[in-house]
């Protein structure tokens, strides 16, 4: 018996060595050499440079001098390397970048002074409005630019982590949230769970929790199917070291770089697993009809019932297809089901190939992580707080079932793209050599997206933010929490302050536990263990009725009544951007955060490519930002533990929609050019335009430096500029209006869930890009486009009627530059509202040219004679007045 166990352990160790050899890690850069990225193996420029070592060949980033000391020594007394490397922008780029920022600040002040000295007496109201707008533009630019002065990149060293924590990695609880199997297609969710179960992390040291906020039997039975298919998929991933470990994305790749140890078996195993996956997808797609058919059979046997039935012949305790009392959305019991029990600590090798088991797993550890399905109780009269409420329930339930000291959260449409993604944040959390590891509340990864249209029409990749702004915050107190792809320290979620302000255990003991965390003694009893970052997962020995009662209490609606949940504990409530505010609360307490750079990307997800859905998405974000400003989470109210420039960054995040009100009206100013010749924002108008061109050009030059150090492309930057203008002409002003109504009426703002539809039925994965969903939110931007097209037509008409060298003519041409610039920025929106015609951009150009020509012809025919008549009349009145008053002086 002992010999058998020894041989089993030896075989498992050999497999582990083989996998670790295949998944080799570059010790300098932390690059995981494991297959191609989800985007056909393409690397982003910034990742490629850093993973080349950040050394001599890198023309942007340079490694910060870090000595391998600080008391971190191995058993032989040798200094151990740090668990992550820090890079800063080279001075040859950073210093000119900072100088340009200072120069533009001086130019803005000079521009304001010039405008005050040349006050427009003809239209004081117009001049005043534009002056207020320009001052706010300058202020918002300063808020946006100051936090970007010291960008920092941090790259985990997975080889160093393996050397120092090869067998004692701490436990991790992984949270996944979903609501609606229609708006969030269930195929995304099952692939997310499968990628998590197959992650390269000690299988007995992490657990996966799915929160189904809709309480649907479809989601539950999909997880049952996942648990079955994972018995094949996870060992296959371990045997062949496949990347990525989401089956849908893995099988969609045309080529894969093989890193496993048995290449001769890959093709046969690949064919077998792919066939099983296709059958698995068929079962997932047919779940709804299967459950309905089963329920019809059971309901026929029980006259008068219209229930939804589980496979074991019992009523589903959640929502039913036909709503009934206690079985409908917003009113159903809580559910906690352990679908996969916690595995043993010893490896369990699979079976050799046979007729019943075509895939040989004899040398592969076939254990699976713990998998738990959760649907919290919902009752009328309670505000269930959407995603934040679901996350807090998972935080409590996981404390009883696994209580890992670290937590990672995912949206249901994000998957693990890099199998070592759970190891990477540990490099920052566990590096306590005076480098802030113990004071790190969370590690945020960039968000990367699949199936975005090739030109990224609506800036879904948002690289300016993810690779620019977030790296800038990395040089301060850390990035903001972005809602998904984030590892937390559990005690930070409990509202405990960082160790620099006191040990976690002593803080917890000093708290008013019942009033802060609720009445569950079982949950409270887990808190001290959860504060130990060295802790693994120690599951409950028996899930008996008493534990079931505790779990029911923790998922109940009333549990949080009279407690600090949603305010000082867990995810923050009563705000649309609960992610940003939750991260802000931790920063306000003095915690730090880290923005991690790994290659391939740690996680990938989906993004809405439909114009309407994308606009609703940023409406929710901008509305939540304003809610943050007008709440107790205002950055101005934070204490001294918040870094000064971090405060500026949060202030910018919570006020940026306000500036767009002025942008919106600026875009409408050309209307006055259509009405009269007398309205000018500023005189002398030509000099004013030259000032504007200079100030705007400087911000674009600064942007080119950011493009350089952020490693993004010019297309990324241009798309960001375009979509900012699209948001500024409709969405952001709408968010400001919503916030004003909330302040007046006291009623909250409802923001709809972003729909991420699949397009498999059409055969075109970009079909949503050319679908027009008409909503009122589109109207303001359409009006802006019409006004500026008309203004261009009038300008062309003036140049034709008066001559381009006359004062009216050349002023019209100068003004037309502004109108054309606005139209260029709104070009993606115009394509979007064209629907299927958007596939042919030439149609748009022809239509606009015809519209401009028509307006110009109308101006020449009707407007120019009228203006000439007005000018002639004004001249006659002037002569008459002169004859009456006589010569002056």
Curated annotation (Swiss-Prot):
It is found in: Golgi apparatus membrane. Catalyzes both beta-1,3 and beta-1,4 glycosidic linkage on beta-D-glucan. Essential for (1,3;1,4)-beta-D-glucans synthesis in grasses and cereals (Poaceae). The mixed-linked glucans (which are not present in walls of dicotyledons or most other monocotyledonous plants) are particularly important constituents of the walls of the starchy endosperm and aleurone cells of cereal grains such as oats, wheat, rice and barley. They can account for up to 70% by weight of the wall. GO terms for biological process: cell wall organization; cellulose biosynthetic process; plant-type primary cell wall biogenesis. One of its GO terms (molecular function) is cellulose synthase (UDP-forming) activity. This is Mixed-linked glucan synthase 2. It comes from the Eukaryota. One of its GO terms (cellular component) is Golgi membrane. PANTHER family: X-BOX TRANSCRIPTION FACTOR-RELATED. The lineage of its organism: Eukaryota, Viridiplantae, Streptophyta, Embryophyta, Tracheophyta. It comes from Oryza sativa subsp. japonica (Rice). It is a multi-pass membrane protein. Its main location: Golgi. Residues 34-53 are annotated as: Disordered. Residues 265-293 form a coiled coil. It holds the Pfam family Cellulose_synt.
